[in-house]
């Protein structure tokens, strides 16, 4: 019997003693993996060039309808580079020489020989294409994004929630708004609360996957598309345990643990965003600064000036999925257009090579009906 697909956000707590329309938009993701602000011009076909700026560590996804180019001041002066649609790029500056590199994504991806850096990032775990030479006031890159996809959600707490309804509704709506600030900028998606509710959770269930099953059985997402449940059910264990989970991309239910006072609000935001990322097709990432890293609750989010971001490869995946959802009435990965499924196959195959011990990418790849399964 096939086991149900469940993806989890895992947290480590240390104890004190121990097939779509013929013409459609594509997506190009550009990330700044340097420490300094970069200003560049993005041109989509014969449209007017947009002057954009990315702070160090930021990224953006850009709508691409025709052949795109990017202009910037590189190591050898002004550069003009053509960009491939539905691809991800990184500004990098090895030896102080600024360049733009495409992240090589392929179903036949091979691991890079260099590897095991102290702080892994996407661009040094995947092979990258070589840079080729080249052709107003800067605006934040997010201003170039249009056509936000709105996903209606129902937010629920269980009967173990201690706060008043007014308090928990305010707390969770603020958290979702903080998540939307990132989702809207990085992949043109926002989650809109259309209903609040409560459910009675079984105090005898201590296994998280069983709790997810119970949540699915007791709660209907209507009138929303997605039900997000916050449970205050459990004692605080030591070691690694599941802090959130869902059964896979576009699944109707997400369950998140809410109880532990050891978890700060930025860490709670990360867990929720991690699971919403799974809903949109994001998988676990080798990038140590990505919200899709496999282990959360690692205290990284407690660092001053910490910024929650997705890695560029997962932003590309989520943008591809959201574009199909925006263009068509899509409710499962099997309903995505064939070109989108094939590109997602490239992404998940490359992620699987980068993280051979993590099964998430392979599990997501197997949900793609347009891709032959081995």
Residue ranges with predicted function:
Residues 253-273:
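Short pre-active-site segment immediately N-terminal to the catalytic Zn-binding motif
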């Amino acid at each position: 019997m096939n086991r149900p697909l469940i993806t989890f956000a895992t947290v480590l707590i240390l104890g004190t003693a121990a097939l779509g329309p013929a013409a459609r938009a594509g997506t190009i993701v550009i990330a700044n993996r340097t420490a300094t602000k970069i200003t560049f011009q993005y041109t989509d076909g014969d449209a007017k060039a947009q002057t954009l700026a990315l702070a160090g560590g930021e990224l953006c996804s850009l709508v691409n309808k025709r052949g795109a180019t990017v202009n910037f001041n590189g190591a050898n002066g002004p550069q003009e580079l053509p960009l491939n649609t539905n691809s991800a790029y990184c500004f990098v500056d090895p030896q102080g020489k600024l360049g733009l590199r495409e992240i090589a994504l392929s179903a036949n991806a091979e691991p890079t020989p260099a590897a095991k850096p102290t702080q892994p990032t996407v661009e040094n775990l995947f092979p990258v294409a070589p840079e080729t030479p080249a052709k107003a006031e800067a605006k934040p890159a997010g201003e170039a994004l249009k056509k936000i996809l709105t996903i209606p959600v129902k937010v629920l707490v269980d009967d173990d929630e201690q706060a008043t309804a007014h308090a928990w509704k305010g707390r969770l709506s603020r958290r979702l708004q903080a998540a939307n600030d990132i989702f809207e900028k990085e992949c043109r998606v926002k989650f809109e609360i259309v209903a609040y509710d409560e459910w009675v959770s079984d105090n005898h269930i201590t296994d998280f996957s069983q709790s997810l099953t119970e949540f699915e059985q007791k709660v209907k997402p209507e009138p929303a598309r997605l039900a997000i449940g916050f449970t205050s059910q459990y004692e605080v264990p030591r070691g690694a345990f599941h802090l959130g989970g869902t059964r896979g991309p576009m699944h109707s239910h997400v369950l998140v643990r809410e109880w532990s006072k050891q978890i700060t609000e930025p860490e709670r935001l990360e867990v929720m965003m991690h699971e919403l990322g799974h809903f949109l097709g994001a998988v676990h990432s080798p990038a140590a600064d990505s919200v899709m890293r496999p282990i959360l609750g690692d205290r990284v989010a407690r660092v001053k000036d910490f910024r929650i971001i997705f890695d560029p490869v997962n932003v590309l995946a989520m943008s591809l999925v959201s574009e199909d959802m925006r263009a068509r009435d899509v409710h499962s990965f099997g309903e995505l257009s064939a070109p989108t499924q094939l590109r997602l196959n490239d992404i998940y195959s490359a992620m699987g090579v980068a993280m051979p011990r993590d099964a998430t990418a392979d599990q997501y790849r197997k949900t793609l009906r347009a891709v032959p399964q081995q």
